[in-house]
Amino acid sequence: ELLNGYLMHKDSVVSRIENDIILNDNYRLPLMLKKGADITPWICSRAVDRHRTNSRLLKKVIRLTDTSDASTVLKAHAATVTDNYWIKFDGENIEYKNILLNDDSLADVALFGTFESISNAKYIHCEYSKSPELTNIGSFEKCWRLRNNKWYMYKKESPQERFSEIFIYKLGTFFGYDMAQYEQDGDCVVTEDFTLSKKYDFESAASIVGDDEDYTLNYKKLYEI
């Protein structure tokens, strides 16, 4: 089914969407998008990695009948923890506050494949999800947890991977770079949402260069911005 509605940034319309196509050119468009672009790849880029074992379990828990990337993301109105974009469907009378992700009751399912946190769930079987796990991208088993009204990402890793994340954070800090802070918690690393509760919109380098790891190309593309 083709998508008709609006690409939103908070409560502002960024672009009209008709039959999956972005109709308006706007400086607020995500870097992946431009006028005339098909919005489907952008939507799918926000999906939880389908190859993660716990992501498949997560979809079963919330009874997703269509487990495609696009359908999974749209179950949460394409909202994420790290930016303010979302999709408003034609016929909906809702505001940004109505789709904000504020439920971490699926955290244990997403991170460990266990169900301890589900007893507190409020939105598991609602038409639209308030959980951030459907749009928690990346290949590691991970989850978002709320602590003092702030989101923290927990990522399950091997000892070597945990060392690498924490070492790079401390090395960058030593040289004066503004780094995302990582700390160890058992067999996980933990980092606070570095967008400062969506004060900033996070755009990954993949939005600019895709999966190309050529340093020269990456530098040129970033310089052009």
Question: What is the predicted function of each stretch?
Answer:
Residues 1-225:
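Phosphate/dinucleotide-binding and metal-coordinating scaffold of catalytic cores
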